[in-house]
Amino acid sequence: MVENGSLYRRLLSDVRGEVMSDPASLARYSTDASIYQMTPDAVVIPRSTEDVQAVMSIARDEGSSVLPRGGGTSQCGQTVNQGVVLDNTKHLNRILDVDVEKRIACVQPGVVLDQLNQALKQHGLWFPVDPSTASRCTLGGMAANNSSGGKSLRYGIMRDNVRAINAITVDGTEARFSAVTAASGDYADLVGDMRALGRREAAEINARFPKVQRRVGGYNIDALVGNDINMSHLLVGSEGTLAYFTELELSLAHLPGAKVTGVCHFQTFRAAMEATQHIVTLNPQAVELIDDTMIALGREIPMFSETINAFVEGNPEALLLVEFAEGSAEANAAKLVELSQLMGDLGFAFSGAEHRWGGVVSVTDKSLQNAIAEYRKSGLNVMMSMKEAGKPISFVEDCAVPLPDLADYTAGLTEIFARHGTRGTWYAHASVGCLHVRPVLNMRQDKDVRTMRAIAEETFELVKKYKGSHSGEHGDGIVRSEFHEKMFGKRIVSAFEQIKKRFDPNGVMNPGKIVNAPAMDNRRLFRYGQDYSVPEFETTLDWSAWPGAGGGFQGAVEMCNNNGACRKLKGGVMCPSFRATRDERDATRGRANSLRFAISGQMPGGLSSDAMLDTMKYCVSCKACARECPTGIDMARMKIEVLSAKRKKDGLTLADKLIAYLPRYAPKAAKVAWFVNLRNKIGLSRKLLEGPTGISARRDLPVWSSAPFRDVEAQDNDPQVLLFADVFNRYFEPENLRAAVRVLRATGFRVAVARDDRSDRALDCGRTLLAMGCVDEARHEAQRVIDATRDAVAKGVPVVGLEPSSILTFRDEFLALCPGPETEMLSNATCTFEEFLADQPDLPLKPLDRPIYLHGHCHQKAHGAVTPMLDLLKRIPGAQVHMIESSCCGMAGAFGYSPDTIDVSIKMAQLDLFPALEVAPVDAVIVADGTSCRHQIAEGTQHQAMHVARLLDMVLDV
């Protein structure tokens, strides 16, 4: 790391893009999905290739280095280094051209794979290299890594699908690397030198390079052998060490037709390994392995448990997911028959003493196939969901061997693990002999670091025995580069060094990768180095499910393995702030890294620092990460700890108090509703009040009702339903509660409002208090609810609520505020209005001839409560229900009203929600249970949304 004064000043002067050197930003770019951590000199978000050229020139002059970075999902340390990090993802992310006839695409390096394939879908094309990180990995990163995926058996790896690369070399020259025909100038000299090296080393390359498809270790110098040389193939897999990629020309493929999956079950792992070489003779496009540990862990993850139960029979020790795409349903069906016959020929059947237990579960339903594929793609993250101190560690995770040796290789590696007192979990690409396996180790302990090296050395000897590759998919980085001499020999490594020297004489481009690498077990480069520690500190919520300081808060934070699932741009909800800003700071990963630095003393000021608060600024507490992050990062809950620490340090502003104590002053405000509502009507008052209240003058506030809901409106004797009347529906939209009471009674239930008989003050979920970090007061409110509902809950009476962010607090934050059996009983008794009614068969409803568009609240999605709502709406006779596929609406309580966050709030809605409603018919019924969602829709579209209770009340047939 260089002193960054002069470097930083020059970057600020010469670069149009963003330049960052503050500790928090450097921390967020110091790690990837590997075990390593290196603090960069600066981070640059370039806007153009001119920015890139300026950075390379400045870094060269200042004695720094340059690290091109895409999604930061590398598992081997390729994308951590000192020097200047160039983040390509925010601006250099355009699809430049698509030639449909020739099936060629030209893209900038920051284009995300899923983004490209979404654009190609309309043409019936796709880019067929499909790594599991497709939702966030970039094409530039894929080329630099020589990535592959589950379908490489049919489509090959990245090198097989790159036609040309435009790149900037370290001297600032931009050149096109492609099939060699005629070349001139300096580029001709470079080509000539590389061809000479290829001729000189051809025999050694042929003798030393593994004869397996999955071989991505070192430079692709075999691409320099022969007459048909494509110079771009030398750059593929070079891990940013030779040049900066500005444009990639890619070969495309026709989208495969209908697919089917045969799930082969095996009672033993070895049986699955032995069967693989026979299964690939059926010409599937993928054969993927899942072992019993991955099945067990997946069943504990909410978003995967239902899927697993749908395709797994019994308790297999291993599954092989065999995918066929033959172009027609008939051909696919025939392949499934062949697969079943083959399994029978191999001696497997689900019944019969004469067979080994096993067989095929056929999956033809498209939605289930997609769910299975998503589960398999999340394999690493599922593995990392273990809450213990040890984690599955990547360092021998993608060795590749010939299929006939696969069973013996896996048995040998299992023996190595056992000899060192650990175990591994297996999954991934059985079809090409490249299985992912990670031994469980604790990288904080010296003994486990020594074990890692011993396992690596023994494993690579085993790989050599079977003439395999020590790097089959994930590249070299820090973790494998030092072993090239063991695997390739001195002469090949010398050739690697000559290539590096020819392209980059002074080692400016991502030094220490592929050649001249540090030791893989150098703890000074570890995320959890020898000096890493987290001193004990006080937290306000219960984190006892995890190990470590802060009552387990440390362990919860350290669950983040930097896989980057939170950087996806489509599908699900996570992470709405990142989708809006494209800033690493605003992804769940960026926040988790910041938290880790804060609690370990690596970021000044700790949890209460301004930098930490700024990191949380755009977090809307949507809870999407709690459900969609496979390692279970609950950033909304972690944000509460940050807000609590900040409040204890600095107290509350007037604006904070207006939010936090809304339930307490609401009864008084409602009495003068006419006066309070004047703020929306008088422009000057909006502007004058913006500063002290923290409410943007650009927003209308919710309108106070002059006739708020009163508890006495629903106090049936011996109630069968306890209704929680939240502050938002009680004082702003009381007709929602009245409609809910009518619907519940029409369904035959006696209804009573949950209330505190010891106080005149209405019950409160504490949500507004938590939003401002007032945890002790929120805990008091939670205990009031627990006490008030105790007797009814003990009798089995359900507690039902309308506002998702309020009622679902009972199932979530209450468990962390007041842990104990009574809270768990309340949590189990709690349901949303639609969850309760979805189980009731006798709901008298009239037909509705208007289309219904449903927007789910983030907390409904996080708790799996959208499906019951969808099912309930479909019970309306004649209903045409359309589910809006959107992330967070962006209002998120106070977030959308703040002058500091209103623009990001609107941007979130503009990504998915607003476009969906723009095409909705004018007579459509828009259903949104969240009060914030309804207000965002009202302000940003021509539609008015309603709560599902109002719609059901409207169509009641009584």
Predicted regions and their residues:
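N-terminal glycine-rich flavin-associated loop
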Residues: 11, 34-66, 84, 88-131, ...
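Long hydrophobic segments that form regular secondary structure
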Residues: 226-242, 255, 260, 267-282, ...
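Ferredoxin-type iron-sulfur electron-transfer modules and their immediate structural context
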Residues: 385, 389-390, 465-470, 477-618, ...
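C-terminal substrate-binding/cap subdomain adjacent to the FAD-binding core in PCMH-type
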Residues: 34, 142-144, 148, 152-158, ...
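N-terminal flexible segment immediately upstream of the FAD-binding catalytic core
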Residues: 1-61, 71-103, 155, 241-259, ...
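Iron-sulfur cluster-binding electron-transfer modules in prokaryotic oxidoreductases
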Residues: 504, 511, 636-958
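A glycine-rich phosphate-binding loop feature that marks nucleotide/adenosyl-phosphate handling sites
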Residues: 74-77, 133-140, 213-220, 224, ...
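Terminal amphipathic helices with adjacent charged low-complexity linkers/tails
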Residues: 248-250, 282-390, 424, 428-430, ...
